[in-house]
Every structure is written in C-alpha cells, then in structure tokens.
Amino acid sequence: MVRAKRKLDHIEYALSTGQSRTHGFHDIDFVHQSLPNSNYDTITCETKIGELSLSSPIFINAMTGGGGEKTLHINEQLAYVAKHHNLAMAVGSQMAALKDESEAASYKVIRKVNPNGIFFANLGSEATIEQAERAVDMIEANALQIHLNVIQELTMPEGDRDFTGVLQRIEKIVLNSKVPIIVKEVGFGMSKETMQQLVNVGVTAIDIGGQGGTNFAAVENERRQRMLSYFNNWGIQTATSIIEATSTNNNLSFIASGGIQTALDVAKAIALGANTTAFAGYFLRILMQDGIEKLLDEIELLHTDLKFIMTALGAKTIEELQSVPLVVKGETYHWLMQRGIDTAHYSRR
C-alpha cells in the first residue's frame, strides 16, 4: 500500500512541479544550409537502439505502474498511443508488481492493448537476476531498463541509502539477460566516467536521462517535512550529457531524455549523437490535462516538424542527421571545455 501510494504521489507531484527546461539545447545552434538538396516526402525517421529497429526516434519513456487502477488506466492509454504511432514504450519500475502480484495488471495491460509493440521492462539497480527475468516475462519485454536514481532515493523519505555493489549487479544482469539492457538515469544526467564504467561491464545502450525534465529531487522534496533543497538543481544537463556520452568513443547506443518537448529538441539531440529520444513528463501532462486525442495529435506534429527540420538541414535519414554541422556555445561549451571535451568537430563536419 505504501509503494502504491508513492506511485500516485509521483504522478501528482511530477505534474505540479512541471519541467525545468534547463536541458541546455539553447546552447546548440545548427549551421544553416541554403542548398540542402532534400525532399520532405523522402525523409525517413527509422533508427535503432542496438539491434532493436524502431520506426521513430521518439519513444514513450518510463512513467508509471504499480499504483492500482489509476496507473493501469494511464499505461493502457499510453500503450494505445504507442500502437497508433508505432512507437516503443517503457513502463515504470515493476518492483511494485514483483512485491505485490495484484499490481501486475497495471503493467500487463500494455500487451493486451498492443500485442506486437516494442516494450521495455523497468527495474531499479537493486534488482537481482531473478527479478530482472520476472520483469521481462511480465510484459514480454523486448529490452530491460535498469534505472539509476541515487539522488531521488536520497531525497525520498523512505528511499535507499546504500548504493554499494550496483555495478556488479548490473554486470550480472547483463551477462544473464535474454534481452538487451538499457541503463538509464532519471533526470540527473550521466558523466563520461559513469558511462565508461557501464561499458566495461558489457552495457551497450544508455539513456542519459539528463537534467531539464521532470525533477525527481523536487518531486520527493514535496513529500518531505524537511526539504533537501540542495538537490533540486543537481545534475548534468541533457545536451551536455549527450556530448559527454559521445566523447567516450564507445560503440554505444544513446537515448536522449530529460526535458525534450519539441521536434527541435529531438533534432538537436540526434545531431549531438543520440540514436533516439524519449518523452515522459511532457506526454503525461498532455494526456492527463488535455486527453488522449490531444496527445495523438501532438506526436503527429512532432514527426511532421522533425521532417521539416531534417529537410532544412539536408538530412534524409536519422544517420545523416547525426552528422550535420552545429555549434556548441554558452554554458554548455564552458562546461565541456573544463571537462576536457573538444566540441570543434561538431562545427567542422
């Protein structure tokens, strides 16, 4: 009951605290192309995360589940949206259903709605091999997200305080999983050092989950009597984290998430090196406040606008979009220079 109540609290406070939009994409400018040699009607948006082929570089990221009928209904609607637009979708942490079988329906509903969809299971880094297998089987998942949420746990009144052995547990799951593993942050970004550690234990796909979207420190602080306000601005911005990711020069698939709301955000994230982008809080807000039809329309417009931007840049495919010239400036540039990451290659390609 406590876990289910927390799930509902997260939805309420995620909506009320909003998104900060401090993602850093305002520091990224495309180099205009007056002769793009492109045709809107022939632009294609297919992409891949590792070996998983996706029809769109937009997917519905982990949001909820395990909070009774309300979370079941949300996942049911999101699965319908995913089916309508042929998008991949992740569920929220399934630990609730592993602890209480009665909550499993709030996750399993997605397969009922969209039997042939691409779905990602989701667990925290405390998960065991056996729990990972059960989570995947629960929704017949195509991949498993393992989320890293140290700051959220520390801010959460009833959260974990021991984070020893996390990398070793992830390595065991990677070695024993029958589906690909995606390690993701939850709004605080990932450093190049963290990503290198994950690569070293066999991880091949990462969702950088940058600062700029739903702020889970702020969400958990709403649930505390004594706020840990020093965590409210903690983290690495989304744009910065993508560039940190690409600087590792590893054969990783990168998912960009954290405050992404527009087609321009999507295009910039991909041009910086992401293979795909993920939306959570923005989609949830539209669904809860304006309804499912509005969300369906918004996703249609996102795809239309992304193709307009790709046409302007002369990028006929997502792969070509990853190599268009752009300039990194402002605070993002200064952060990266201090970190020893040269951005000049982006502007000269």
From Swiss-Prot:
Entry keywords, A to Z: Cytoplasm, Flavoprotein, FMN, Isomerase, Isoprene biosynthesis, Magnesium, Metal-binding, NADP
Binding residue positions for Mg(2+): E153
Cofactor(s) named in the record: FMN; NADPH; Mg(2+)
UniProt name for this protein: Isopentenyl-diphosphate delta-isomerase
InterPro entries, per database record: Aldolase_TIM (IPR013785), FMN-dep_DH (IPR000262), IPdP_isomerase (IPR011179)
Biological processes annotated in GO: isoprenoid biosynthetic process
Residues annotated as binding FMN: A62, M63, T64, S93, N122, K184, T214, G258, G259, A280, G281
EC number annotated for this UniProt entry: 5.3.3.2
Organism: Bacillus cereus (strain B4264)
Reaction catalysis annotation: isopentenyl diphosphate = dimethylallyl diphosphate
SUPFAM superfamilies, per the entry: FMN-linked oxidoreductases
CDD domains on file: IDI-2_FMN
Function as written in the Swiss-Prot or TrEMBL entry: Involved in the biosynthesis of isoprenoids. Catalyzes the 1,3-allylic rearrangement of the homoallylic substrate isopentenyl (IPP) to its allylic isomer, dimethylallyl diphosphate (DMAPP).
A cellular component term, taken from the record's GO annotations: cytoplasm
UniProt-annotated binding residues for substrate: R6, K7, Q152
GO molecular function: FMN binding; isopentenyl-diphosphate delta-isomerase activity; magnesium ion binding; NADPH binding; oxidoreductase activity
Domain of life, per lineage: Bacteria
Classification of source organism: Bacteria, Bacillati, Bacillota, Bacilli, Bacillales
SUBUNIT field: Homooctamer. Dimer of tetramers.
Subcellular localization(s) per the UniProt record: Cytoplasm
Family under the similarity heading: Belongs to the IPP isomerase type 2 family.
